[in-house]
């Protein structure tokens, strides 16, 4: 799979995505190999489980975190267009269990009854830092919804179809962003507002061969002092607003 070929060719074991969840206290590292494996699993799930194609659209309605990145990379590997925070227009909506429970329930009910506009699949993603599913963390899965954690793990970590490189994909969307980063870039982000913002903050540094640190948490936990500490610990080269 060529999506992350630049990273895999240079140093496949170096952390390329680091996740700080200050609410849970979790810190997770994802190497190029690990990201590639997750992208393949998601791509296989999108095609085999959800029967999506190039003319489909998925919406990632998830808080900042590694699972949002994994879903995005998988969609790009499968050449399936992505939007953020716009479930109503999508064929499949990836929705956070806690942050968007009402939206998920409405979408599932619309699909079941045929009374609403939404007719796609709903995939529920927990906020568990290790990617466990709804039922695995003691929750109850909404009728008609798909539990992301146990479902995606079923699929292989190799994707057989041809893929474009992440650099080519970013160049089509935000060509100027590629020149901003280098293989030594290690950027800190706290979130994104839309797809272009996600491309600029997360995909562009990865496409350049760099790495990304995502830090999330309540303001009383993720204080300016804590962010400064993360910058020092992770040797961050740039903080993106």
Each PLM stretch: what is its role?
Residues 45-81, 85-87, 182-204:
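Conserved AMP-binding/adenylate-forming
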Residues 18-52, 153-181:
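Conserved AMP-binding/adenylate-forming core of the ANL superfamily
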Residues 60-61, 68, 72-102, 109, ...:
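Short beta-strand->loop structural element characteristic of the AMP-binding/adenylate-forming
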